[in-house]
Amino acid sequence: MWGFRLLRSPPLLLLLPQLGIGNASSCSQARTMNPGGSGGARCSLSAEVRRRQCLQLSTVPGADPQRSNELLLLAAAGEGLERQDLPGDPAKEEPQPPPQHHVLYFPGDVQNYHEIMTRHPENYQWENWSLENVATILAHRFPNSYIWVIKCSRMHLHKFSCYDNFVKSNMFGAPEHNTDFGAFKHLYMLLVNAFNLSQNSLSKKSLNVWNKDSIASNCRSSPSHTTNGCQGEKVRTCEKSDESAMSFYPPSLNDASFTLIGFSKGCVVLNQLLFELKEAKKDKNIDAFIKSIRTMYWLDGGHSGGSNTWVTYPEVLKEFAQTGIIVHTHVTPYQVRDPMRSWIGKEHKKFVQILGDLGMQVTSQIHFTKEAPSIENHFRVHEVF
């Protein structure tokens, strides 16, 4: 059964000073990143963050009703698109929403909802990169965009993300790529169903929103749990916001454009999409969806398999080059300079080289080269890409 619930996470405040959001001087207490702790600092959030709603969509089916994923949506608000009529003014026509941009993000291993990560004996170390926190980072990176975090369908041992609905995978989520698994069909229908599900949820005056009062001033610690409050060791309840000054347009596929981002294990989804391009284009709806994809980001891709971390098949990349999609790769020494997994760096170099030779617009950047390879820097690629 489809469902949704609001998510609010105090650790979002911990990342705001690093991202340049809000008043850093007033957030000194929030700079200390302790597992599950929300600090207690009251930060002045930027207008962009205040105007966003976070919605968890559970059990959203794809092309096959038996294959579903959870999605986390951080919605963009209409900026200056709704006129507040003065008393006595004649009724005005409802403005048409502008074309929307949607960012689709596929997380890596261990990434989960903040509440789950803080309770795990090992994964709590990486709670700053929870699904909610990364959604906020992406919202800052892609302003005025709808941020969709597409959660893997299975997490082996609570660590290894497995995208079984997008690509044939082994127990630990290492992919076995082919040309007809149906990743594009699943993604397209997943979005269609998620958009429909969120239509009413994100309409005006339907939900509480993140604003300066609900996040900063009116979030109070409470020992009890609430679905409407901020999650953490101590749940913080948020009062209802002033909805009259805000306008939220529901997600729409009409004239929409897309950015696809894979991080670490999440890159296996992007790779599978490349393998399916030729066949997927035969479906007119999916072909239209492919043409609406503007950019794809590979962020430090990696998985537990012994090869195929990056796509290096010329015939597959030739088909990809014909799409005109802009490609960005951002990597760290943790992946591409690991002597025990030397194929990753070689495959990455070949991926970029072949696409460049095919005339595709592709950029490649390696980060943290002067620092020792670490998982922390692997995650920090979110901050610098």
Curated annotation (Swiss-Prot):
Signal peptide: none annotated. Pfam families: C2orf69. It is found in: Mitochondrion matrix. InterPro entries: C2orf69_mit. May play a role in the respiratory chain. The gene is C2orf69. Keywords: Electron transport, Mitochondrion, Primary mitochondrial disease, Respiratory chain, Transit peptide, Transport. Belongs to the C2orf69 family. Residues 1-24 form a transit peptide. GO terms for cellular component: mitochondrial matrix; mitochondrion. It comes from the Eukaryota. This is Mitochondrial protein C2orf69. It is linked to Combined oxidative phosphorylation deficiency 53: An autosomal recessive mitochondrial disorder characterized by global developmental delay, hypomyelination, cerebral atrophy, microcephaly, liver dysfunction, and recurrent autoinflammation. It comes from Homo sapiens. GO terms for biological process: oxidative phosphorylation. PANTHER family: MITOCHONDRIAL PROTEIN C2ORF69, UPF0565 PROTEIN C2ORF69.
